[in-house]
Amino acid sequence: MKIAIEAQRIFRKEKHGMDYVALETIREIQKIDRQNEYFILVSPGEDRCLQESDNMHIVQIDYPSYPLWEQIGLPSTLKKIQPDLLHCTGNTAPLWCHTPLILTLHDIIFLEPKQGKNQSVYQKLGRCYRRFVVPRILNKCRKIITVSNFEREHICKFLHWEPKKITTVYNGYSSHFRPITEYQAVTQKYIGTEHYFFFLGNTDPKKNTARILQAYRHYLNTSSQPLPLLIADLKEEVINNYLRTYGLTDIKSMLYYPGYIPNKDLPALYSGATAFIYTSLRESFGIPILEAMACGTPVKIGRASCRERV
């Protein structure tokens, strides 16, 4: 059987949740399946994190944007490969494609009312693209996979779908997430103190960054020995904008914001943290919760969404 797997962004240097889910899924398939033939469809990128094997081939498709890659480049490549099955791993798929389709629909947050207005232009365009594509491809799917029963129930209720049409395949965490005892060499690259709180930030309103910063100022004002806050994935100009907008410039000296942190450094940063904070307003799963727990780190979560079940 010839199986094509869409994994467009796994070679990009700054990968995030869905990219890692696709990458780790492919790596595990590579270990256990020697019978079927796989074609991994990717964009060119700096991080060549996957190697070919006898029955697994990497096919690079070079288009300047995600929609063009998915709606023109991907169908064109499928015509050449002629696979028996296509698995699209990141919520969307080609609108015009005759290959039997399996879709991983991580969430339908993009179909729900927005929770704020501070999204980037890139996020807004991505939301519009998903809102257009997803309703038009769902009925074409042979099977839909989602990542938690919480999200499965939500999809069925929101889209009026029968539960039998959707299969839950839970996310997990990579084996390199484990307690690290000698973490100082890594943590010193990002924060110059031994004790700290760790937060994964984002400009998406659902990540709740503004309220975290407001709550952190309250903590600073009420604690006799406050700990600094390490914020991943937010650049200085974004932090400065939050602080100005919400009148929080007085807390800047207690914040560390190195920007994107490579996945290989996260186990040490989780292990060194006094606690990991994950209080986003809406998630379908929440992989960082498992990663932090696997490293032995206490986790502070909000009650919204799927996190209590996780």
Predicted regions and their residues:
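Carbohydrate transferase catalytic cores enriched for Leloir-type hexosyltransferases
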Residues: 1-308
